[in-house]
Curated annotation (Swiss-Prot):
This is ATP-dependent Clp protease proteolytic subunit 2. It comes from Synechocystis sp. (strain ATCC 27184 / PCC 6803 / Kazusa). It comes from the Bacteria. NCBIfam families: clpP, PRK00277.1, PRK12553.1. GO terms for cellular component: cytoplasm; endopeptidase Clp complex. Its EC number is 3.4.21.92. It is found in: Cytoplasm. Pfam families: CLP_protease. Keywords: Cytoplasm, Hydrolase, Protease, Serine protease.
Length: 226
């Protein structure tokens, strides 16, 4: 099995708050037919906003892909905003999201808040060129995929070849998205490589560091930089 050496677990994640269960806020909307209650993510989906706020696995990928396809069918011309705060996860699940982002008709605006690590950083870089963003205090981290191999020698060899293929595939796409030379990218991803939002912009992973004046408005298209 190949993972992007994640979900990355920050040593800071152990500092309190572990026993608090996640609560999804509800919002109430008034209409001529009365009140309707929505969970906040469903309400934001109506504004073409998708949240990736968990590790990336098959279930999460299915949900994100379904939302992308729905919004593509609803309006192929209007931008989709994908907010990312993810430690990464399954390479295969992440590539399912990535390929869908590349194939649908609307521009996908990617926005990092918090942490985009491993596959999270890869998806961040895969947004529409000129429309990849991060909040000022965000952290972005890239590294190479890691997979475990077990079984007979021939099985280990097959899995090792797959890991090398995935590593080369991801690096090739990161070269395309960042403009960095392959040699530098290979060197940087040998270990966890952390960047601030400004450093990620200089590296080519994102195009803008968000400030209040350029905060994306879901009601209007985002102006591409570059």
């Amino acid at each position: 099995m190949v993972n992007s050496r994640s979900p990355y677990r920050s040593p800071l994640s152990t500092l309190g708050g572990n026993n608090i269960q996640s609560v999804v806020p509800m919002v109430v909307e008034q209409s001529g037919m009365g009140e309707r209650a929505f969970d906040i993510y469903s309400r934001l989906l109506r504004e073409r906003i998708i949240f990736l706020g968990t590790p990336v696995d098959d279930q999460v990928a299915d949900s994100i892909v379904a939302q992308l396809l729905f919004l593509d069918a609803e309006d192929p011309e209007k931008d989709i905003q994908l907010y990312i705060n993810s430690p990464g996860g399954s390479v295969y699940a992440g590539l399912a999201i990535y390929d869908t982002m590349q194939q649908i008709r609307p521009d996908v605006v990617t926005i990092c808040f918090g942490l985009a690590a491993s596959m999270g950083a890869f998806l961040l870089s895969g947004g529409c060129k000129g429309k990849r963003m991060a909040l000022p205090s965000s952290r972005i981290m890239i590294h190479q995929p890691l997979g475990g191999a077990q079984g007979q020698a021939v099985e280990i060899e097959i899995q090792a070849r797959e890991i090398l293929y995935i590593k080369d595939r991801l690096n090739t796409m990161l070269v395309e998205h960042t403009g960095q030379p392959m040699e530098k990218l290979q060197e940087d991803t040998e270990r966890d490589f952390f960047m601030s939002a400004e450093e990620a912009k200089e590296y080519g992973l994102i195009d803008q560091v968000i400030s209040r004046p350029n905060l994306p408005d879901p009601t209007t298209p985002v102006t591409s930089l570059g």
